[in-house]
């Protein structure tokens, strides 16, 4: 399928036409990737509450299909679904500049819902996500987790510290992410804490068992330092009590530990959707390879 068309039920006003023509090249998420869709399937509007729930928007965005808005044709938006490995010219709708070689991720609007709301009607708003370098997306996810965790044991009036955690500076831009608290974010914090507790419980015995062997086999200074640190820890036993290792049990423990580490990483890591190949002088448009 080469095109997805969003058909408007009523004639667009000249003002709306002008607004849409200004965002040609924008990445527009759609709920259904079919030849004809309605406005309610386009953008993030139906997932936005008065509290601008970032967790809810993030989850919804991950379930949608990214398209590129190509043109306005009569009373309909014409969009192109993206395919892995293809090259697209996309618009920078976020606050941060891009550079050639950047890997870009798509995230919900985090600095101003109004800024990413392109047009408004009585029944529907066109709200777009923002495209940022993956390191920015990762930092935003980390800060959201930190803010949520801090909110559990700090008073709401602790503004100064909150603002410090909320502020993100990248290249020549500084933004403040919203300090909202929602149940999905709390679930993420709870699950991360559980995973870290299990990692803390399982990792020491595995490290105590295998790092000394690696230190004997290798002369790498990092391994030697790890061995020295482990000798200072007050750990019970010697890893397996002198008994031959139970292979199935060892595999289960190692697999479980690595899965937990992978889970913690997945909470904050964003998938790279684009690699920037070329950028216009004003940094508003870029030619990118779609990598998802």
From Swiss-Prot:
Which UniProt keywords are listed? Answer: Capsid protein, Host nucleus, Virion
GO MF terms, alphabetically ordered:
structural molecule activity
Signal peptide residue numbers: none
The GO cellular component terms are:
host cell nucleus; viral capsid
Subcellular location per the Swiss-Prot or TrEMBL entry: Virion; Host nucleus
InterPro entries on file? Herpes_capsid_2
Q: Name one Pfam family in it.
A: Herpes_V23
Report the main location listed first in the record: virion
Q: Please name the HAMAP family in this protein's record.
A: HSV_TRX2
Q: What role does it play?
A: Structural component of the T=16 icosahedral capsid. The capsid is composed of pentamers and hexamers of major capsid protein/MCP, which are linked together by heterotrimers called triplexes. These triplexes are formed by a single molecule of triplex protein 1/TRX1 and two copies of triplex protein 2/TRX2. Additionally, TRX1 is required for efficient transport of TRX2 to the nucleus, which is the site of capsid assembly.
What family is this protein classified in?
Belongs to the herpesviridae TRX2 protein family.
Describe, as the record does, how this protein assembles with itself and its partners: Interacts with TRX1 and major capisd protein/MCP.
Q: List the protein's name.
A: Triplex capsid protein 2
Q: Which gene encodes it?
A: TRX2
């Amino acid at each position: 399928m080469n095109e997805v068309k969003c058909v408007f039920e009523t004639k667009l006003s000249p003002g709306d036409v002008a607004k849409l023509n200004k965002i040609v090249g924008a990445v527009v998420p759609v709920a259904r990737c079919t030849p004809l869709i309605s406005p309610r399937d386009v953008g993030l509007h139906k997932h936005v509450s008065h509290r601008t729930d970032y967790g809810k928007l993030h989850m919804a965005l991950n379930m949608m299909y990214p398209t590129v808005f190509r043109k306005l044709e009569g009373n309909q938006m014409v969009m192109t679904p993206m395919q892995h490995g293809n090259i697209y010219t996309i618009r920078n709708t976020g606050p941060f500049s891009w550079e050639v070689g950047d890997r870009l991720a798509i995230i919900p609007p985090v600095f101003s819902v109004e800024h990413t709301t392109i047009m408004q009607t009585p029944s529907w708003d066109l709200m777009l996500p923002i495209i940022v370098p993956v390191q920015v997306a990762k930092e935003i996810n980390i800060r959201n987790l930190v803010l949520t965790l801090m909110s559990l044991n700090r008073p709401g009036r602790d503004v100064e510290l909150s603002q410090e955690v909320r502020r993100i500076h990248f290249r020549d831009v500084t933004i403040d992410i919203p300090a909202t608290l929602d149940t999905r974010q709390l679930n993420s914090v709870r699950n991360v804490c559980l995973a870290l507790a299990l990692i803390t419980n399982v990792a020491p015995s595995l490290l105590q068992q295998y790092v000394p062997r690696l230190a004997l086999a290798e002369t790498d200074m990092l391994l030697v330092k790890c061995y020295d640190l482990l000798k200072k820890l007050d750990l019970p036993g010697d890893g397996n009590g002198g008994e031959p290792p139970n292979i199935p049990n060892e595999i289960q423990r190692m697999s479980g530990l690595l899965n937990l580490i992978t889970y913690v990483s997945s909470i904050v890591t964003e998938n790279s959707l684009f690699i920037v190949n070329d950028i216009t002088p004003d940094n508003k448009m870029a030619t990118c390879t779609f990598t998802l």
